UniProtKB/Swiss-Prot annotation:
Keywords: Amino-acid biosynthesis, Aromatic amino acid biosynthesis, Lyase, Pyridoxal phosphate, Tryptophan biosynthesis. The beta subunit is responsible for the synthesis of L-tryptophan from indole and L-serine. The gene is trpB. This is Tryptophan synthase beta chain. Belongs to the TrpB family. Pfam families: PALP. Pathway: Amino-acid biosynthesis; L-tryptophan biosynthesis; L-tryptophan from chorismate: step 5/5. It comes from Lacticaseibacillus casei. The keyword Amino-acid biosynthesis applies. One of its GO terms (molecular function) is tryptophan synthase activity.
Length: 406
């Protein structure tokens, strides 16, 4: 079975970012299905009835708009910029993932699909997909690396509780990239009833654009909310980056405002200068994988290197093509945060604000801890909390040597 990193057909026009990132590098077996998805997205994204249906689910099911919360204690403790937290952790299912899943599931419904498949790393995208499949009466199958099923057992059970079948992926490094491979292989199998709900801003066009479109609600809201609270734009927007869906959603409404600094925070793991890292933009090089041209952790022969992070949601060996372009153009800055720094931030935000945030989000919080004291008191940071940290409590306790009964 061919996967999307085996280039058999490509488009030099579709979904390009910057000089040459993005595109469609896919096997022939997927081109027809991808064309159907592209047409449906382009036809429906601005359709008033589709937009009304999407908005109704976002408001009445997903609990939007999410709060823009002034982190008073953190602001006072760090002694610099005012810190606002965009609370995606308060969405139904506990993360930003639901925004994109609702949109793609509605596309699937309009295409007459009966079955949703998806990859997941930390499990949040899988939970969101299983949730919407249950709501819409669709079958659901989730592919998750065996390493991740072992460290996110609670989310595995949650998906099964919602009616999904979870497939532990035992190939490769048994992490997110391998889950993506397995899902792509399943999607390439002959079937007219299946829709692939891709969870991050990666893959062949139109997925990066589509995910950005559905996740841009994060920054559309935060821009309006901060205007109401402070009557100004933020000076900086900070979000964690794996594949990059929460970050591109957090950045989208500000990309054309050059006064707003955009900072994506990658997982440096044991250190960006070690081989136990997932700092793709800092360490990666241009390549083709999972249907797109972007930056990847790879060797001289173009083979994908293993990556590592304490965070199951950030240990992807690539990054979305728009992030690669934003980095190349200097419009956004990308920094690395280590496991130790993220774990410290997990404790810090809990004690300062009474919020147990996802370990993915705590990479962004750790950077805010560093940068806020260097900024003026009249400056403002918006930091996106991509999800809640219930799923991480046991693993963080284990990391710190605390014995807890899961």
């Amino acid at each position: 079975m061919k996967t999307l990193n085996e280039t058999t057909q490509q488009s030099t026009r579709a979904g390009r970012y910057g000089k040459d990132f993005g595109g469609q590098y896919i096997p022939e077996t997927l081109m027809t299905e991808l064309e159907k998805v592209t047409k449906a997205f382009n036809d429906l994204k601005d359709n008033p009835e589709f937009k009304a249906e999407l908005n109704d689910l976002l408001v009445n099911y997903a609990n939007r708009p999410s709060l823009l919360y002034y982190a008073k204690n953190m602001t006072e403790d760090l002694g610099g910029a005012k810190i606002y937290l965009k609370r995606e952790d308060l969405n139904h299912t506990g993360a930003h993932k639901i925004n994109n899943v609702i949109g793609q599931a509605l596309l699937a419904k309009h295409l007459g699909k009966k079955r949703l498949i998806a990859e997941t790393g930390a499990g949040q995208h899988g939970v969101a997909t299983a949730t919407i499949a249950a709501l819409m009466g669709m079958d659901c199958e989730i592919f998750m690396g065996k390493e991740d099923t072992d460290r996110q057992k609670l989310n595995v059970y949650r998906m099964e509780l919602l009616g999904a079948k979870v497939h532990p992926v035992t190939s490769g490094s048994m992490v997110l990239k391998d889950a993506v491979n397995a899902t792509l292989q399943e999607w390439a199998s002959p079937s007219d009833d299946t829709f692939y709900v891709l969870g991050s801003a990666v893959g062949p066009a139109p997925f990066p654009e589509m995910v950005k479109h559905f996740q841009s609600v994060i920054s559309t809201e935060s821009k309006q909310q901060l205007q109401a609270k402070e009557a100004q734009l933020p000076d900086m927007v900070v979000a964690c980056v794996g594949g990059g869906s929460n970050a591109i959603g957090s950045f989208a409404a500000y990309i054309d405002d050059p006064s707003v600094q955009l900072v994506g925070v990658e997982a440096a793991g044991k250190g960006a200068d070690t081989d136990r890292t997932a700092a793709t933009i800092e360490r990666g090089s241009v390549g083709i994988f999972h249907g797109m041209k972007s930056l990847f952790m790879q060797n001289e022969d173009g083979q994908i290197d293993p990556v590592y992070s304490i965070s199951a949601g950030l240990d992807y060996p690539g990054v979305g093509p728009e992030h690669a372009a934003l980095a190349q153009e200097g419009r956004a800055q990308y920094v690395g945060i280590t496991d130790d720094e993220a774990v410290e931030a997990f404790t810090y935000i809990a004690k300062q604000e009474g919020i147990v945030a996802a370990i993915e989000s705590c990479h962004a919080i750790a950077y805010v801890e560093k940068i806020a004291p260097q900024m003026a008191k009249d400056q403002i940071i918006i930091c996106t909390l991509s999800g809640r940290g219930d799923k991480d409590v046991a693993s963080i306790a284990k990391y710190k040597g605390v014995d807890v009964d899961e």
